[in-house]
């Protein structure tokens, strides 16, 4: 499931929902070139595309097959899509969690920024993400003593570091 969005709460909801359902989340940068989008879409072949806005949808529309790929959007877009707010209103989340997930199963594919050729996809397992979170929580233990800690993050959520930090904010 490809996620193309700027940082916003629906991004986090989408990412966690895909991974909890047993899908593979593929967050990508909003700043890629047209060639990068084309390459990534051809490389990972997502069955589902989550996009935040019509502006971002226009960046990828020439490289997707709307007959084969379902689209979920955060806002109305020019193509037929499901709106995330409608899905959230109608979903029983407990039923959607894949109870058979294992630590060694793929959870997401993080693509590099592509500064040296085509972006490279790195597969992260559920266990790899959990290990990163466990290590970060250990480092951030002093923050757990603060009531309602505040985090300031600025990297795109599709960045490998920020992708981990999003989970730490929930844990801490």
Regions found by a protein language model. Give the residues of each.
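ANL superfamily adenylate-forming
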Residues: 55-103
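Active-site charged/polar residues at nucleotide-handling catalytic sites that mediate phosphoryl
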Residues: 43-45, 67
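Conserved pre-ATP/AMP-binding loop-to-beta segment of ANL
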Residues: 90-111, 118, 144-150
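Conserved AMP-binding/adenylate-forming
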Residues: 1-32
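Conserved AMP-binding/adenylation subdomain of ANL enzymes
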Residues: 130-153, 157-172
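Short hydrophobic alpha-helices that are characteristic scaffold elements of the AMP-binding
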Residues: 12-21, 43, 159, 168-172
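Conserved AMP-binding A3 loop
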Residues: 107-133
């Amino acid at each position: 499931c490809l996620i193309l969005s700027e940082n916003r709460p629906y991004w986090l909801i989408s990412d966690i929902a895909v991974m909890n359902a047993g899908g593979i989340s593929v967050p990508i940068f909003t700043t890629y070139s047209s060639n990068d989008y084309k390459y990534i879409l051809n490389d990972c072949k997502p069955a589902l595309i989550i996009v935040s806005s019509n502006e971002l949808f226009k960046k990828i529309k020439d490289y997707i097959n709307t007959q084969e790929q379902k689209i979920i959007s955060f806002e109305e877009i020019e193509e037929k899509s499901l709106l995330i707010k409608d899905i959230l209103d109608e979903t029983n989340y407990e039923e959607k969690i894949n109870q058979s997930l294992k630590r060694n199963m793929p959870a997401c594919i993080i693509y590099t920024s592509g500064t040296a050729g085509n972006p490279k996809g790195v597969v992260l397992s559920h266990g790899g993400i959990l290990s990163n979170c466990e290590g970060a929580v250990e480092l951030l233990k002093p923050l757990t003593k603060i009531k309602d800690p505040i985090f300031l993050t600025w990297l795109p959520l599709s960045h490998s570091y920020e992708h981990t930090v999003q989970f730490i904010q929930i844990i801490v």
